[in-house]
Each structure stands twice: as C-alpha cells, then as structure tokens.
C-alpha cells in the first residue's frame, strides 16, 4: 500500500513523497525499509535521525524530517488504526472439535468455534461467532456473548456472564470462589459459601492469568470497555466502572468500587471496600487504604496526592543528610550549653 493511500484510509495528511510503498509496521527502533513507524511527541524526535523506517506518523509539533510522514493529533492512536489495516488476527473456522465435551441444554449461536478438549457444563449459552480455544473449561449456567473470544486454558466458573465482543486471554479464571472465611470462637475459619457470580459487560478484555472472584451473595461487576492486564486479582464483590484500566499485578480486595475511567498502574493494591472516584489515576506500586476523590492523581503507600508524594520522596532521599545535620546541630547546641553553664559558675 502506498503511503498516500494509507493516509487517506486514516483521514490524515501526508508530508513528503506519498508514493513510497508501505509493506508493514514496526517500532521506531526496529523499523526498516518498507515499514511505517511512529513517535508520540517531539520528546522522542531524536529517534527520527536514527530510524531506518520508510515513513513515520508524527504529531504536528515534531519538526519535519527527511522521512515522509503522516501528520496526526494522536500518533499512537493513528498507528493503532494503521496496524488494524495490516494485521488481521486469524479466526478459526466455525465448528465443534470432535474432542469437545458438551453438557445438557447447551445452546450455541451461529458460527461458534469450540476448540480441542473444550469442556462445557450444563445450561450454558454461547452467542453467535464466539470462539472458545482449546482446553477451556466452562462450568454450568455460564453465558458468553456475541463474538467473544476465550483463549486456551481459561476457566469460567458457574453462573459467570460474559458480554459481547470480550476477550479473555489464556489462563484467566473468572468466577472462582471468593476468599471468604469467618473466624469461629474456637479459633478456626468457617468457609462462607460463595453463591454469587461474576458479570462482565461488553468489550472487556481480561489478561492472562488474571483472577476475578465471585462473592458470597450478589455479583462482582466489570463495567463495559474495561481492560484488565495479566496477573490482576479482582476480589469478591468488586464493582469496576466503565472504561477502567488495571495494569499488571493490580490487586483489589473484596468490595472495592472503582468509578469510570479509573487507571490503576502496575502493582497497585486497594484495601477492602475502598471507593475510588471517576477519572482517578493511581501510580505504580501505590497502596490505597481508603476512599479517593474523583479526578485525582495519587502515589505512594499509603497513597498521597501526587505532588505531595513527589515532595515527600525528595525529602526521604535527603534523610541521611538531614539526620547528620541535625546531629551536628545537637552537638553544637550541647557545646554552647556547656559554655553557658560554665560562665554561670
């Protein structure tokens, strides 16, 4: 595809030769002849001189280079759209593999694919054009929506409801028993029955080896368009709003509530029943012990407003120096006190 044709598909203008041929896409460091890449802002303009890419996607502020370019307000998003034109994941053909095992009253929509060794319980409904890859286990009473893809080795526990156009990556477990135990007078732990379920709305993505638990009663809810990374733990009874982003190794204790468009960076931990408001951003490795107001950016453990955390972190790095200064001052004060005392006598 010529660069000009690609730009027309993307709805963006071209600077430079529109007739260069684009055969693929790659990162700025790895791109070579015939490949398109991007940089997100002028902050990374130094890579333009080093790249061997045939053409680039640039924002309007990045200086014009000798490399032909497509101009965009959002280069990363435009690159994603370009990638969709070149890369179409191969979908398996509709059908049921002969090794798949289906329980009673299973309802399959049109053009469903069930891979090898898939095991499906009773009273399961799978929507049209859904794809279930090999070795998945789907318990009783599960509902899976239209065009949802469940990758290999996933487990969907009883009563789980997955919406339309979701993606569940390999190894994820959705709807497993919540971690519910009640202390007894004898000092033991009594298991609380976990009779609830997990409800996942449309266009949610769940990463590899993520775990989303069901509660004792009611349901755990994942809002529409939310993206959950690998190794994320969502505890029983959590309520996650629409279009949230949970990055790798985030852990939510039971009953946590997230508003809309909340971003939790890697390894964030949230204490039980804490509520995090809409559009909040939590920096990596932060600990959230209690509620967070909407629209804030917090960092640290326990989490503080980001600006305060930056100042605190700067002071922490200076603590050895400040401590030594304090010791020096203490010694000087002690010497002054001795001289004063000697003068009085």
Swiss-Prot record:
InterPro entries: Hexapep (IPR001451), LpxD (IPR007691), Trimer_LpxA-like_sf (IPR011004), UDP_GlcNAc_AcTrfase_non-rep (IPR020573)
GO biological process, alphabetically ordered: lipid A biosynthetic process
A Pfam family: LpxD
Active site: 236 (proton acceptor)
Keyword Transferase: yes
Keywords, in A-Z order: Acyltransferase, Lipid A biosynthesis, Lipid biosynthesis, Lipid metabolism, Repeat, Transferase
Reaction it catalyzes: a UDP-3-O-[(3R)-3-hydroxyacyl]-alpha-D-glucosamine + a (3R)-hydroxyacyl-[ACP] = a UDP-2-N,3-O-bis[(3R)-3-hydroxyacyl]-alpha-D-glucosamine + holo-[ACP] + H(+)
Family: Belongs to the transferase hexapeptide repeat family. LpxD subfamily.
Protein's name according to its UniProt entry: UDP-3-O-acylglucosamine N-acyltransferase 3
Encoding gene per record: lpxD3
